[in-house]
Amino acid sequence: MILIMIAIDNKLLTIEHVSREGGSHTMPAKHYHEGYEIYYLLEGERYYFIEDRTYRVRKGNLVLINKNILHRTIDTENPDHERILIEFHENFLKPYSKETKDISLYSIFKQKQFVYKLNVEEQLWLENHLFKMIKEKKSKNKGYVSYIRLLLIELLIYFNRQLKIDSISIVEYPDPTHEKMAEIASFISKNYNSDLSLKNVASLFNYSSTYLSRTFKQVTGFSFVEYKNNIRIKEARKLLQQTDLNISDISSMVGYNNLTHFGRIFKEITNYSPLNFRKLMSMKRSSK
C-alpha cells in the first residue's frame, strides 16, 4: 500500500499519492473546501459525485474541482485503486501573481466539465509531472518550495491549453439510475430553501421513500438528509460571507425554520458556529 501525504507552506498545498486494496474506501461525506482540487486516477475505477451527478472515473481520467464544490468519491464494484490528489489554495501561488497576469490560471476549474479523459501522451506527461512534484518535496533541495510552485503553474497552464481540445471527452453518467439520481440531486440543489422531505421528493419522482433513500445513498455517497443539509449550509456560507444579513434571516432563507437546529447543522458541517464563521471570513478579508 502506497501512502504519501505531503503538506507545504502551512497546508496551502497538499499532495497525496495513495494506493488502496481491499475494503471500502468511500471518502467522508462532508467535503468541500476553500481550495482547488486536482484528482488523477492511476489505476482502478471510482465513482465521483460532483455537485449533483455521479461520474464513473477510470484509469487515466483527470478530475478538476473548483472551490466550494460539493464532491465525494465512492467505491465501484471493485474498490481497489491508486490515485494522486493535489489540493491547493490560490494563496500558494500568490508570490508569482505578477508573472502569471497573462493567463487566468484558475479558469479551467470554472468550467462545467469536471472529468476529462486523457489520451496516452497526456497521461504520460501528467504522471511524469505529478511524480516530479512529489520527488521535489521528498528531496527538499534548495528552493524546492519555489520549484513546486513553478511546477504547479506549469501544470495549470498545460490544463488551460490542452483541456480545451475537442478530442478530450467528458465521462458521462455510468447508467440510467445514476442519471435519475442526478436529476433528483439537481432538484434538491435548486429547491434547497423549500420544505423538502424524503417522502415528498420520493412521491414527486414516483419512488417509494425506502427505494429513494437507499438508491440515493448508493449513487451519491450521501444520505438524502446529508445532501440537503450540505447544499443548504453551502448557501448559508455564501450569505454569511457576502451579505450583512442577520443569522436568523439566513437560517430561514436556506430552509431552516429553527435557528438552533440551523446552528447545530452548520457547526457539524463547518466546525464553526455561524457567528464565528462570519468573524473568521471577515478577518481573512481584512488580512489580504
Where are these predicted regions, by residue range?
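Generic protein-terminus/edge-of-domain signal
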Residues: M1-L62, I69, E77, K98-L105, ...
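A hydrophobic/aromatic-rich effector-binding and dimerization subdomain
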Residues: I2-E21, I74-K138, I157, R161-D166
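Regular secondary-structure segments
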Residues: L42, E127-K138, A185, S189-Y192, ...
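Short hydrophobic/aromatic patch on the recognition helix
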Residues: G60, Y211-F216, H261-F262, F266
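Short, Lys/Arg-enriched, Trp-marked, Pro/Gly-tolerant hinge/linker segments that flank
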Residues: K112-E122, K137-L150, L156-K190, S194, ...
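Terminal helix-turn-helix DNA-binding modules in bacterial transcription factors
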Residues: S186, K190, D195, K199, ...
